[in-house]
Amino acid sequence: MFRRALMCCIAFVVALCPGVMARTWELPPDVKTLPVNGYEMAYLERGTGVPVVLVHGTVSDYRWWAAQMEPFGERSRTIAVSLRHFYPERWNGEGEDASVRQHANDLAAFITGLQAGPVHVVGHSRGGDVVLLMASAHPELLRSVVLMDPAPLEALLPQTPQATAEAEKRRSFVSAALERLQQGDIEGGLERFIDGVSVPGAWQKMPDPQKQTMRDNAWSIKSLLTDAKEPFTCAEAGNITVPVLLVTGENSPRPYGVMMEALAPCLQQHEKVTIPNAAHAMNRANPQAFNAAVLEFLAKH
């Protein structure tokens, strides 16, 4: 009887707050949430001090930063977020509110909600684009920015035949991956996507725990076709007033290098670092070198 009364009270409160989406998924141990723009944004936290917010890319979530949480947490309040519709939510791809712009707005609201003053923020791949858009609109929320191989935004790329060909190649394999997902072939869709952003055979060589993380977030591929056309300009990048570190892997695919070469002249202040013996997943492939480089940068700011 008490349980039924309690559930009725909860339903009544939710009905009075239609702008807040009730969470229907379970949270893993140690994972917290913070309400942002009507969504419960999940995050994992370690350490104390000035916050460092870590933002994952496509087919990933807060677990992407496993090799950073403890080393970073020894020096700062380290917070790895899961963006809207990423694990631990079990999203089925329905809806249109998982764009890079929505995620940038959510990230700004999340940082504001921490009520901890300006933060350092680190973004990988598409997460780098999320950070880039957020930092341009809200530099006052930040101490510094780290961008790891941000995904190519077509509006920033040079208008050359090579850049056009690379953009078309990316659209092609993303479209093929999405088509397989829509056919119910999750494994095939992920294989097509991962081999496209990395090298042929990359999916088959990946350890199963990493594959499972990507299975949990497979439908995040859906937004990539529209994300690439986000009308972000060089002038907007120039709004970022805090120091920026651009990070790439020694063996990162060329499109990421083209993106950073186009972005760098737009920034008011930036540094660059290349992580040896690593490609696009540089924080996982060579965590020791990555952690040392990023922590050194953060310590200066």
Region locations from a protein language model:
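Active-site nucleophile elbow and catalytic-triad environment of alpha/beta-hydrolase enzymes
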Residues: G196, S220-E236
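Conserved alpha/beta-hydrolase catalytic His-Asp/Glu region
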Residues: L181-K222
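Conserved HGGG/HGGXW glycine-rich cap/lid loop of the alpha/beta-hydrolase fold
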Residues: Y39-G93, F110
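Catalytic active-site module of serine/aspartate enzymes centered on a nucleophile-bearing elbow/loop
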Residues: Q269-H301
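Alpha/beta-hydrolase fold catalytic core
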Residues: M1-V52, R75-S76, A299-H301
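Conserved hydrolase catalytic core segment
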Residues: G117-L156
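Conserved loop-alpha-helix segment in the C-terminal half of the alpha/beta-hydrolase fold
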Residues: C234-A278
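Active-site loop/oxyanion-hole signature of alpha/beta-hydrolase fold enzymes
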Residues: E70, I79-V122, R126, A292
